[in-house]
Amino acid sequence: MVSKGKTAVVIGAQWGDEGKGKIVDVLSENFRVVARYAGGHNAGHTVLIGGKKFVLQLIPCGVLRPGCRGVIGNGVVLDPIAFLNEVQRLRDLGVAVDGNLFVSSRAHVILPYHRMVELASENAPGRVKIGTTSRGIGPSYEDKMGRRGLRVADLLDSTLLKKHIENACKEKNTIVHALFNAEPIDPDKMYNEYAKAAEKVAPFVTDTAVLLNNAINSGESVMFEGAQGTMLDIDHGTYPFVTSSSATSGGAVIGTGVPPTSISTVIGVTKAYCTRVGEGPFPSELHDAMGDAIRKKGNEFGAVTGRPRRTGWLDLPLLRYSNMINGTEWLVVTKLDVLDELDEIPVATSYKIDGKESEEIPAQGCGFDKIEPIYTKLPGWKTDTTKISKYEDLPAKTKEYLKFVEQQSGAKVGILSTGPDRDQSIYTDAFVNALGLKHLGK
């Protein structure tokens, strides 16, 4: 009997932007398939290879590695135009996309009226601003859950596509005009554009659930690439300031069609501090010069939107919560170098809520308003870590910081990232041995 291939789910342990793209890239040489399972082209992953900058929004990072296939699973919402533009950008950079990239026939499609509805809704008077990327992600998921969405398989059926667009435009145009006084969308123009796009998308489309299960059952290794972060998860995040899909490890099963028993390990990616884009609770947020300094040194601006990220200290109650929800076995700590010059590093270890110490994560967004973080101050290492390549060569105080994070969070540190390049990655021996890594992302 052939043993099943190893699998790993890589998730964001915070509010997204943790550096998952780089980590998936450096690990992907050890995997034959990398699969996206949630989100859309609102998830910006930046990867630097040989001086070239690759910004991936929808396509899995694995396609940047020769011999590694990329899969866009059924849990993703696909904007066909954005997808084709990203494919062309990769071709222009010399990436072999054709024959190495596959799109689920069951993935739902983002259409122009989804963006129109989102923009109108986000800017409506009296509406709570979520801080979306205005790319139609949420409304597409709404149509999916309302059983009125268009799937990729339907996109390829010209008769069904035309009928769907005609009916949907009648509904959406009526809604946005009545509620937001927005201009209507021309269904004929939309059909012509998307019928042409469908012809170019068609060669990538397949039943990716079959592809992934066959790969695992034949002994191939598969990595599942999460989007956003746990605290943006539709169920477990800081609702309503969340994304519209499952950003946790459980989403990998639902969003690709593989069974839960096929998941070997979960890798959680966290920055050495915290960031957040858009609105919503952020207990350890910094509103002073230190927050500005971290933003500047960490280049904390969105890969997709360019928006400045809010910054704050590492929040261990949130990290413990993320590890619990995801079953995280290994941690990847990124942006460690951003803290290199600090004399001391505060870390939130618990909260004070209504005068009482607590580690509970409030279910209500307003509950976070009552939180006062309790900090433990750790000594800084005052050493440049960007050129260190071995764990044993790290400063003693850096190791103390990492050991503290391990003890407090309940997960083991597997990788440290000290810069944007592939070779600015430090692996622990325990992680390398546990995953059987042969290539260390150079």
From Swiss-Prot:
Record's catalysed reaction(s): IMP + L-aspartate + GTP = N(6)-(1,2-dicarboxyethyl)-AMP + GDP + phosphate + 2 H(+)
Active site per database record: D17 (proton acceptor), H45 (proton donor)
Main location: cytoplasm
Disulfide bond sites: none
Pathway entry: Purine metabolism; AMP biosynthesis via de novo pathway; AMP from IMP: step 1/2
One annotated GO molecular function: magnesium ion binding
CDD domains named among the record's database cross-references: AdSS (cd03108)
Binding positions (IMP): D17, E18, G19, K20, N42, A43, G44, H45, T133, R147, Q228, T243, R307
Note describing how the cofactor binds: Binds 1 Mg(2+) ion per subunit.
Broad enzyme group: ligase
UniProt: GTP binding residues: 16-22, 44-46, 309, 335-337, 417-419
Cofactor(s) needed by this chain: Mg(2+)
Self-association state and partner proteins as the record states: Homodimer.
Role, per record: Plays an important role in the de novo pathway of purine nucleotide biosynthesis. Catalyzes the first committed step in the biosynthesis of AMP from IMP.
Name the record gives this protein: Adenylosuccinate synthetase
Lineage: Bacteria, Pseudomonadati, Acidobacteriota, Terriglobia, Terriglobales
Gene for this chain: purA
